[in-house]
């Protein structure tokens, strides 16, 4: 039996400042067209009938979010984010109530397609651990010498994947793994890494490589181009 709609909530950690973008405002509030990156990122989540609520974790010093139309959306809930991504995600999970599944999406990843989201959500019917959207590595990968920009060796890319978001896990499992990983001083670069630290092996769901995260100034134009290439069916 498929899970009920209320079983899935989304958490969007949006408390970061995005220093690599070299802009005065946090990158999630930069605009593409007539919407912020955050609004583009959240739109597919709000439009999907399986997701009952989107919880956005923002910085206590954030003054921009309240001015967005998104702030008045009935399915949006705002919580206070933390110093690290994991802290913000945990704050969102604490506000999630009795939802069974938690889907975590980057605030600066505006090009999520509806098809990728659908494939990821299908894990709720087949997986006990959950998984992530990911794209197989296509480029030749080089490992650098420690502390200097020189090639140490070429890395076999056969089993390498680029981790993307959203990432989807049973809510209690994700909360427990994040809590334990933080307590044990583990490096948590995404939600899956917390599960890995605790001995779990999340599934890889092949996703589109154009589901990019806006991290550097040149990414903004690329994301704008990708958004124009998504059809209404792919974004709705």
UniProtKB/Swiss-Prot annotation:
The keyword Repeat does not apply. The record marks 157, 213 as: Positions MEP for the nucleophilic attack. It is an enzyme of class 2 (transferase). InterPro entries: IspD (IPR001228), IspD/TarI (IPR034683), IspD/TarI_cytidylyltransf_bact (IPR050088), Nucleotide-diphossugar_trans (IPR029044). One of its GO terms (molecular function) is 2-C-methyl-D-erythritol 4-phosphate cytidylyltransferase activity. It catalyses: 2-C-methyl-D-erythritol 4-phosphate + CTP + H(+) = 4-CDP-2-C-methyl-D-erythritol + diphosphate. Keywords: Isoprene biosynthesis, Nucleotidyltransferase, Transferase. The record marks 20, 27 as: Transition state stabilizer. Gene3D superfamilies: Spore Coat Polysaccharide Biosynthesis Protein SpsA, Chain A. Its EC number is 2.7.7.60. One of its GO terms (biological process) is isopentenyl diphosphate biosynthetic process, methylerythritol 4-phosphate pathway. Coiled coil: none annotated. Pathway: Isoprenoid biosynthesis; isopentenyl diphosphate biosynthesis via DXP pathway; isopentenyl diphosphate from 1-deoxy-D-xylulose 5-phosphate: step 2/6. PANTHER family: 2-C-METHYL-D-ERYTHRITOL 4-PHOSPHATE CYTIDYLYLTRANSFERASE, CHLOROPLASTIC (PTHR32125:SF4). Homodimer. Catalyzes the formation of 4-diphosphocytidyl-2-C-methyl-D-erythritol from CTP and 2-C-methyl-D-erythritol 4-phosphate (MEP). Belongs to the IspD/TarI cytidylyltransferase family. IspD subfamily. This is 2-C-methyl-D-erythritol 4-phosphate cytidylyltransferase. The lineage of its organism: Bacteria, Pseudomonadati, Pseudomonadota, Gammaproteobacteria, Enterobacterales. The gene is ispD.
């Amino acid at each position: 039996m498929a899970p009920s709609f209320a079983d899935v909530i989304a958490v969007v950690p949006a408390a970061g400042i995005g220093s690599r973008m070299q802009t005065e405002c946090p990158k999630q509030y930069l605009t593409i067209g007539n919407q912020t990156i955050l609004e583009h990122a959240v739109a597919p989540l709000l439009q999907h009938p399986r997701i009952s609520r989107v919880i956005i974790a923002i910085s206590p010093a954030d003054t921009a979010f309240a001015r967005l139309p998104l702030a008045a959306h009935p399915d949006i809930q705002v919580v206070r984010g933390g110093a690290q991504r994991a802290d913000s995600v945990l704050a969102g999970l604490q506000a999630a109530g009795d939802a069974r599944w938690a889907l975590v999406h980057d605030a600066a990843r505006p090009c999520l397609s509806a098809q990728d989201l659908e494939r990821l959500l299908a894990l709720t019917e087949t997986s006990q651990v959950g998984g992530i959207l990911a794209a197989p590595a296509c480029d030749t990968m080089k490992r650098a010498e420690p502390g200097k920009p020189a090639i140490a060796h070429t890395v076999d890319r056969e089993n390498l994947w680029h981790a993307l978001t959203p990432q989807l896990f049973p809510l209690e499992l994700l909360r427990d793994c994040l809590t334990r990983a933080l307590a044990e001083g583990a490096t948590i670069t995404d939600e899956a890494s917390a599960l890995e630290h605790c001995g779990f092996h999340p599934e890889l769901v092949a996703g589109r490589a154009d589901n990019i995260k806006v991290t550097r100034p040149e990414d903004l134009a690329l994301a704008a181009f990708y958004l124009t290439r998504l059809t209404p069916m792919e974004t709705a």
